[in-house]
Amino acid sequence: MDSVVFEDVAVDFTLEEWALLDSAQRDLYRDVMLETFRNLASVDDGTQFKANGSVSLQDMYGQEKSKEQTIPNFTGNNSCAYTLEKNCEGYGTEDHHKNLRNHMVDRFCTHNEGNQYGEAIHQMPDLTLHKKVSAGEKPYECTKCRTVFTHLSSLKRHVKSHCGRKAPPGEECKQACICPSHLHSHGRTDTEEKPYKCQACGQTFQHPRYLSHHVKTHTAEKTYKCEQCRMAFNGFASFTRHVRTHTKDRPYKCQECGRAFIYPSTFQRHMTTHTGEKPYKCQHCGKAFTYPQAFQRHEKTHTGEKPYECKQCGKTFSWSETLRVHMRIHTGDKLYKCEHCGKAFTSSRSFQGHLRTHTGEKPYECKQCGKAFTWSSTFREHVRIHTQEQLYKCEQCGKAFTSSRSFRGHLRTHTGEKPYECKQCGKTFTWSSTFREHVRIHTQEQLHKCEHCGKAFTSSRAFQGHLRMHTGEKPYECKQCGKTFTWSSTLHNHVRMHTGEKPHKCKQCGMSFKWHSSFRNHLRMHTGQKSHECQSYSKAFSCQVILSKTSESTH
């Protein structure tokens, strides 16, 4: 019986060195070693692993030994080198052992000659690097922009920002992979193949490990519960990140603008706003994005893909998180409650935005005019006013819009769709915001109260307009004549005096109107509706103007 030693294949750690490795490095080491020995076992069924007084992988990871699979032990004498003892009957030649060793080296650690930027990346756990990380050093450097990173995984993510998500046509991705299974799964990141599907919600994944982790969100007990909002989590890391939303602990601070963030991922995304880097470009319309998530979300606007369906109402969504938030409408689950006014919300985003109505925080400021905004989406729409960028164009009338929300609302003026219906009176609405304001008429809920005169309002828009009556602020200025207005809608109507635009056209007689109010009054001429009645003569008129003129001449 001959023994084959794998010192030139496996990484040799002492037990003291092993104790210094973090969990991610241990997991990587375990996965590589297990696959290596599975591959070796497939070469010969008689493979056996022997150690004297050793500490096993199961002891280190707290896992039970499988009956179907023999897992190697760490040898004694303060070494984690592996020794293979196998019956070499039929395989006893020296050439066979040489070939076997070469085979294991190739399978275990594929050496990378250099990725697309010329740097070599070696993915084996390295104790020296680990000690550097502990000392606060950042040993991984990008050769393209010289940015340094603490972890290899961070460098790899950063490298993708230079090349985009996909390799150029006809070229293969040259990123280094430890073993064939990692290389195979990495290939899926380039092809976007996601063959592993969750049976509970339909979400798909590129790797079985991601699916296994996701399944726990459906089945596993959530042991970490937040005392403030009673939200529960599977993992301690997720729980810790959530707690920061209550404590306002923001450990990641931008040195350029001073903004602080709860999550490192959010901080990294923010840093790209200073560099202006947008590596993800849409092949359909040419629009570029800073983040891959935003790029993927945008792509679905072209494909119309909505793989996530609500089982209760049949509504479909492009994103799983949007489906989860939607499900709370059916369950009535409102996890986020405001301590100031008691209002509860189904989504964290809505809750954070609501809190700013109490604090007055407007973190998004326009560099051109100094105007500040509560929401990033509103800020982006405002910026397009300066750049005159109009991404959304109506195919029916040619009108263009700076925001998708305004564009969708405009489309409903053509289709007549009013998807929001009041359950109390049956009235329908084109906009969700208008619907919410209407509901408050029934509930008599008035969230916004003026400190100057005590008047209360059901909508923030009406409240903001009212405040301008006290301050005299008129932020909307006509570029042609310099006249200023309190409301943006008033400015739009005024601009039509200069352009002569008449967007409201009567389908019955072909007449066009500049203003929607004039158009409505005209429609009543066709329908015969007379909603304005004179109290003195009990005579009705189709519009308020005619009633007012009649009253002035007769009374």
Curated annotation (Swiss-Prot):
Location(s), subcellular: Nucleus
GO BP annotation list: regulation of transcription by RNA polymerase II
Domain KRAB per the UniProt entry, residue ranges: 4-76
Coiled coil start-end: none
Keywords assigned: DNA-binding, Metal-binding, Nucleus, Repeat, Transcription, Transcription regulation, Zinc, Zinc-finger
Family the entry assigns: Belongs to the krueppel C2H2-type zinc-finger protein family.
Protein name per the record: Zinc finger protein 57
Source organism of the structure: Homo sapiens (Human)
